[in-house]
């Protein structure tokens, strides 16, 4: 399994017979192996998670399938599947499940080639100290936990989780809760706004003490990882 970090929350997961592209909006995409089926996921319509340019991929990789959150304004096509929160879809050899985001759209759980892959989109514990009221922060916490608790104890082979530097001292909350709530084997931070140093800080912190070896350090865009 090869993982390529594109930019922000965008990753490519290449398996033996399938290629998954998550939340692309900018960055350099490699040439995809045309012998493998390509699936493009977009978790919601925010500008840092979606770009309509993804629909051009169909011209260079025939047979691409799009799995998009329903809030995305997309063309009508048989190869475009729109999903709401808490829905399930089986397409080809993929089993796809969605969770309600605590912001907009969905998080994806994808079962393919005996792997369970999670991409959180903007599902995160969005605690904004000094910006939101205590009541707003409590509500954001509840939204996040209500979704993650639905997969409590689940075995996840590969997870992509927000680690947002803008949250100040609370940057770790969502990542930490997810790791403690699930049986996740490998976790990639995302949504860190090019603050690569935050990953090292988090891995060295007491918060990550019990799972630091499961966290993959990202150092630059288009970095590849063989797992």
Question: Where would I find each of the regions flagged by the language model?
Answer:
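Short active-site oxyanion
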Residues: 1-2, 62-65, 186
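Active-site metal-binding motif and surrounding structural segment of the metallo-beta-lactamase
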Residues: 26-72, 149-160
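Core dinuclear metal-dependent hydrolase active-site scaffold
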Residues: 1-35, 79-155, 219-227
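Binuclear metal-ion centers of metallo-dependent hydrolases, dominated by the metallo-beta-lactamase
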Residues: 4-8, 77-89, 171-227
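Structural recognition of the beta-strand scaffold that forms the well-ordered cores
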Residues: 119, 158-161, 188-189
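A short, acidic, amphipathic alpha-helical segment used as a generic capping/interface helix at domain edges
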Residues: 143-149, 168-177
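Active-site environment of divalent metal-dependent phosphoester hydrolases
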Residues: 27-30, 46-50, 72-76, 87-89, ...
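Short amphipathic alpha-helical segments
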Residues: 33-34, 52-55, 79, 131-132, ...
């Amino acid at each position: 399994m090869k993982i390529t970090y594109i930019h922000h929350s965008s990753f490519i997961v290449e398996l033996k017979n399938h290629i998954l592209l998550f939340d692309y909006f900018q960055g350099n995409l490699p040439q995809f192996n045309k012998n493998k089926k390509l699936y493009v996921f977009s978790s919601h319509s925010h500008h840092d998670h979606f770009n309509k340019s993804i629909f051009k991929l169909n011209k260079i990789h025939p047979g691409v399938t799009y799995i998009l959150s329903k809030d995305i304004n997309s063309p009508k096509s048989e190869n475009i599947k729109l999903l709401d929160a808490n829905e399930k879809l089986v397409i080809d050899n993929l089993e796809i499940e969605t969770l309600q985001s605590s912001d907009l759209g969905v998080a994806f759980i994808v079962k393919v080639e005996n792997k369970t892959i999670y991409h959180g989109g903007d599902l995160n514990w969005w605690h904004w100290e000094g910006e939101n009221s205590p009541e707003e922060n409590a509500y954001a916490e509840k939204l996040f936990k209500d979704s993650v608790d639905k997969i409590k104890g689940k075995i996840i082979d590969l997870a992509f989780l927000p680690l947002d530097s803008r949250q100040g001292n609370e940057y770790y909350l969502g990542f930490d809760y997810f790791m403690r709530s699930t049986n996740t084997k490998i976790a990639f931070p995302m949504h860190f706004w090019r603050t690569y140093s935050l990953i090292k800080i988090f891995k060295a912190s007491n918060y990550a003490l019990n799972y630091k070896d499961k966290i993959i350090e990202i150092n630059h865009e288009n970095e590849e990882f063989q797992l």
